[in-house]
From Swiss-Prot:
GO terms for molecular function: nucleotide binding; RNA-directed RNA polymerase activity. It comes from Ourmia melon virus (isolate Melon/Iran/VE9) (OuMV). InterPro entries: DNA/RNA_pol_sf (IPR043502). It catalyses: RNA(n) + a ribonucleoside 5'-triphosphate = RNA(n+1) + diphosphate. Residues 846-860 have a biased composition (Basic and acidic residues). Residues 839-860 are annotated as: Disordered. Transmembrane segments: none annotated. It is an enzyme of class 2 (transferase). Its EC number is 2.7.7.48. This is RNA-dependent RNA polymerase. RNA-dependent RNA polymerase which replicates the viral genome. Keywords: Nucleotide-binding, Nucleotidyltransferase, RNA-directed RNA polymerase, Transferase, Viral RNA replication.
Length: 860
């Protein structure tokens, strides 16, 4: 009788993988040689057996172990990387192939194989190549198979143990059903669990990025006539984008309203306030409150006080100045992602702040054309099922047209500067300055637009000690406020040019069926066109990324999401994002803190545990969702111990974490009472919701004092508090309607000298968690003391507990002040109302008005 297989859990798998790596890498002594004696013979025999089973060259492994290729940093990194990968594959295979499908011998064989490639510094390339090949075969990719790399010592797709290779090959290569495509995509995404690269690899990636940005010559194979065609196509694309946007009411005037970013600047790190901290210097001089204006509402007038008047703020053009240096300084910083380093640049605070005002205008330009509206909202299945499918088929009637899912390598670094400047010049031809003047060739805004994209002086070091390393001569900088919109336009223009050449006629953007989001693109074209598309995007500097481009008749991919196109509509195809299983990783090798993970803005998709858990289980069936949630909760147990004793599953608006519920649970009455309290419309509940909104997203409103001042003005004027459906709020936001108080922007511009409550460090994180605990305890005490105002004495014992279903579902509406109400109820809250550009522009006497006053004069 065979011995019973030992049950494995992720912790046991991780420890076993680490033990194998340490065992192999620990064979050498400090001189880099094998220990002498019989032990050496035993080890060599063991290495020989490992190589035989894994089909690895024994000589290369023994040579790597004996010739001192190992360093302490490499061993430490390899141990962490291999253990993460093995546990990730274990989780995915156990879910798709069934429990106990992975044996302990499989874990050991995989760890040995990965150690061999890690010693030779090829593990990252090996994992990406093998798993990308599996996904391509599962999606029935029609492009020719790539050539085998010289360092690959086994067959394609065989990156697991011998037994698991057979199972995975059967599912992903031979059978290739939708569930098998999901398995292949899940295996490919396991790379997201990789830790940050070691320091020597980071330096190599920084040097590669610098080489790309400082090259002078044209890339080999660039055809000058084609380049001129692409420049004309970029200008034509901008013209059509502007035409579509102006038809929808786009305001081509550069915005005056822009609040400084708190991201790092060249002069100031994020720990010191970033761009905002550089623009608004600390001023400890005692000040009296400054009268910003008088607010009138239904005959009631109340003063609005701030902390600095408009004449004192430095966020004005007069203080910022209009001189643009010939070459802007920028400091580069590595952002660590799985298997790669993304180089982000931090530019000068003044010029980048002004560029952000242009950025808002460009976002509005892109959102009015269907090809480029994805940066403003998430992908919907109708975008692919209707737009891409039908438009692509209409262009090439009578031909079979597959879906082309494109992605590029180092797109911003490699983008041809001539194409970037063509886009910039044409966009500037259509824009108006903040004082309604066209941007002529010597306009400061046009000069600024040019210089925030090209011609930077690149520095290394920190904000106090910088060393110039090179001058930018190619590409764009990832970190420039304007690089992403320009990249979208170039990507769209080049691909549309290819489609026109393929179908032999002029194609409008609406007819093209192209979806673009930065360096991601999805479109349809015949197989005969793929080589020409590859050539054109390469001329533009957009080199297709190996393993991330797919050409399939049934499946497509956009923004790392898969869709099955075999039915009448696009069907979302879920797969496991292994990094989300561990709760602390959404994208890249981030360094999120506990407060950001537990509490965040509930109106937008962010990086909290609730958002990540929903992204993890999205699209799966109930059984799979429950298994994934169990694994998720087990992995984040340490983080949950740091936060107040809040409900895990109650909606964040009612004081919980908002984790998705996949099985029945029993809710604590204490949590249900708090949910009932926060759902009430009383004054204390209003203030509690206001503070909860602030603590969820402290940087979004900048300072809690601004929220409390708005609350004070609303109460003084008795502005009604209304329940507005979320759908209506989203419609208003999409239409560009600001439902906030008219004086909110003036308050924000007055508040920067107050500083931020929570610095971006460990101390600020602990302070924010402490405030959350105090806030939650205070709300709990108030909820316990609250009494009903009607009924008999026995019935007025306190709030009724909210039903568990309603507590989990959350509110269907938002409480906001109705600044625009007419006689306690205006038509702005009617769902059939069509929003105007400014819904508050009515001349009726009972409309709210903000009367501006100067520092030395009274109200007008």
């Amino acid at each position: 009788m065979e011995p019973r297989q030992e049950l494995l859990d992720p912790e046991r798998v991780r420890e076993e993988a680490k033990r194998i790596v340490r065992w192999l890498c620990g064979l050498v002594d400090r001189t880099g040689k094998l220990p002498a004696g019989d032990y050496q013979g035993k080890i060599l025999n063991t290495v020989s057996e490992i190589c035989k089973r894994s089909k690895l060259p024994c000589g290369e492994l023994a040579e790597a172990l004996t010739k001192g290729r190992l360093t302490r940093s490499l061993v430490d990194y390899s141990e962490l990387l291999i253990s993460n990968l093995v546990v990730g594959y274990f989780d995915v295979l156990e879910i798709y192939l069934g429990k106990q499908s992975v044996r302990l011998s499989d874990i050991r064989e995989m760890a040995c194989k990965y150690t061999f490639y890690a010693i030779n510094r090829r593990l990252e390339d090996y994992i990406k190549f093998q798993t990308a090949w599996l996904q391509a075969r599962a999606m029935r990719d029609v492009t020719p198979e790539p050539e085998a790399p010289s360092w690959l010592n086994e067959g394609f797709g065989r990156c697991f143990s011998a037994l698991l290779n057979r199972k995975v090959h059967l599912r992903c290569v031979l059978r290739a059903r939708p569930n098998d495509v999901s398995l292949a995509a899940s295996l490919y995404q396991v790379k997201r669990v990789a830790p940050p690269l070691p320091d020597d690899q980071i330096e190599k990636n920084l040097e590669k990025s610098l080489d790309r940005l400082t090259k002078d010559e044209e890339p080999a194979g660039v055809d000058e006539p084609f380049l001129e065609d692409l420049k004309r196509e970029c200008k034509r694309t901008v013209d059509e984008l502007v035409q579509n946007a102006r038809r929808e009411g786009w305001n081509r005037k550069i915005s005056r309203d822009c609040f400084p970013s708190q991201s790092a600047a060249f002069e100031n790190p994020i720990s010191k306030g970033g761009q905002l901290g550089q623009l608004v210097k600390e001023n400890n001089t005692p000040r009296l409150p400054v009268l910003l204006g008088m607010f009138e509402y239904k005959g009631r007038v109340t003063p609005v006080y701030g902390w600095a008047d408009d004449g004192d703020t430095i966020l004005s053009d007069e203080e910022l100045g209009r001189e643009v240096p010939a070459a802007l300084k920028c400091r580069r910083s590595p952002v660590l992602e799985p298997f790669k380093v993304r180089v982000i640049t931090m530019g000068p605070a003044v010029q980048y702040y002004r560029a952000r005002r242009v950025q808002g205008c460009l976002w509005d330009l892109l959102k009015h054309t269907r090809c480029t509206h994805l940066p403003n909202r998430p992908v919907e299945e109708s975008d692919i099922g209707f737009y891409v499918r039908r438009r692509g088929a209409d262009l090439f009637r009578g031909e079979e047209v597959p879906y082309v899912s494109g992605d590029y390598s180092a797109a911003t670094d490699n983008l041809h500067p001539d194409l970037s400047l063509s886009v910039v010049d044409r966009v500037c031809d259509h824009l108006l300055s903040d004082d309604n003047r066209p941007l002529d060739p010597v306009s400061p805004w046009r000069v600024l637009f040019h210089r925030v994209l090209v011609g930077h002086r690149i520095y290394d070091g920190n904000s106090s000690r910088n060393t110039e390393v090179a001058a930018q001569s190619w590409g764009q900088l990832m970190g420039s406020p304007l690089s992403f919109p320009v990249l979208c336009i170039v990507n769209l223009a080049v691909t549309r040019y290819v489609l026109e050449k393929a179908c032999g006629r002029i194609v409008t953007l609406e007819e093209s069926g192209i979806l673009v989001n930065g360096d991601d693109i999805l479109f349809r074209c015949p197989e005969r066109t793929i080589p020409f598309w590859t050539r054109m995007v390469t001329i533009a500097g957009l080199s297709p990324s190996p393993g991330k481009n797919f050409v399939s008749y049934r499946y497509c991919q956009l923004n790392s999401e898969l869709y099955d196109m075999s039915g009448s509509r696009a069907e979302y195809l879920p797969f496991i994002k292994a990094n989300l299983i561990y709760g602390t990783l959404a994208r890249g090798c981030e360094r999120k803190r506990a407060a950001d993970l537990c509490y965040g803005d509930t109106t937008t998709e962010g990086g909290t545990f609730g958002h990540r858990a929903r992204a993890l289980i999205k699209g799966f069936g109930p059984d799979m969702q429950d298994r994934l949630m169990s694994r998720f909760l087990h992995s984040i147990k340490g983080f949950l111990e740091k936060i107040p004793e809040v409900s895990w599953f109650i909606h964040p608006r009612y004081g919980g974490l908002g984790l998705p519920l996949t099985r029945p649970v029993t809710h604590n009455p204490y949590h249900l009472r708090i949910a009932a309290y926060l759902s009430c419309g009383g004054e204390q509940s209003q203030e509690a919701r206001c503070m909860m909104q602030w603590l969820s997203a402290p940087t979004k409103s900048f300072n809690a004092a601004t929220l409390l001042r708005i609350l004070e003005v609303a109460r003084n004027c008795k502005v009604p508090f209304r329940k507005v459906p979320f759908a209506l709020l989203h419609r208003a936001e999409a239409a560009g309607v600001d439902l906030e108080a008219l004086f909110r922007k003036a308050l924000l511009r007055s508040a920067p000298r107050l500083g931020v409550e929570y610095p971006s460090n460990e101390s600020g994180d602990m302070q924010r968690l402490g405030d959350w605990r105090r806030f939650f305890r205070d709300v709990g005490r108030k909820a316990a003391r609250t009494r009903c105002r009607s009924g008999t004495a026995d019935e007025r014992k306190g709030l009724f507990l909210m039903s568990p279903d309603n507590a989990v579902k959350g509110p269907q509406y938002e409480y906001i002040f109705d600044w625009a109400s007419h006689n306690m109820g205006g038509n702005i809250w009617d769902p059939s109302y069509k929003f105007r550009a400014d819904p508050f522009s009515s001349s009726e006497s009972d409309e709210p008005r903000a009367k501006e006053i100067g520092p030395n004069r009274g109200p007008e």
